[in-house]
Amino acid sequence: IPRPIGWISTVDLEGRDNLAPFSQFQNVTFDPPIVMFASNQNSLGERKDSVRNAESTGQFVWNMATYDLREAVNISAEELPHGVDEFERAGLTKLPSRLIKPKRVQGSPIHFECTYLNTVRFPGASLMGTVDVVFGRVVAVHIDDACLTPDGLVDVLKIQPLARMGYYDYTYVDNQFRMVIPGNNEAVLAGLEGSPLRARAATGGER
């Protein structure tokens, strides 16, 4: 089953940049906007840089992985020593963020700047040890204008987001269809749209 990729950029306390993709990434809620990514330990039994950096600095960026960026995503997945810059290794250009310190990936069409909320640790049964599930609140969103439709919606077919499957397999979005659930419950429809303003209006205004 395809899963969105958490291409997470962070910076450590010494100012060294880090970039890594995670197969377990998802939005948790849209109001407030919260996302999560899950990370096993590395092959040495250590917590990964992305987790440690997010916890120590309180910040991370999600960069949308796309079909055009697939090779760079794969290169940035390699397990490397602490302090190695995956941006440079993958030949990527860095963009400054607006509110936080971690850099963004130039060429990625959408970025979420996130502030760290908390980590939930689960015991792991594999050789990779425990699993860290990191939660963050989205404080800024960047969307490339070239990836918007005339109506101001994200053109997913143009972006071609990359998704992780099983084994060594990936896929990308090249087809979509639209369905609206029956009924006229405005609060439910607003929730499905992911529209905070419409949801608040449908439930009695600002909260």
Task: Give the positions of each predicted feature.
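Basic, polyanion-binding surface patches
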Residues: 1-207
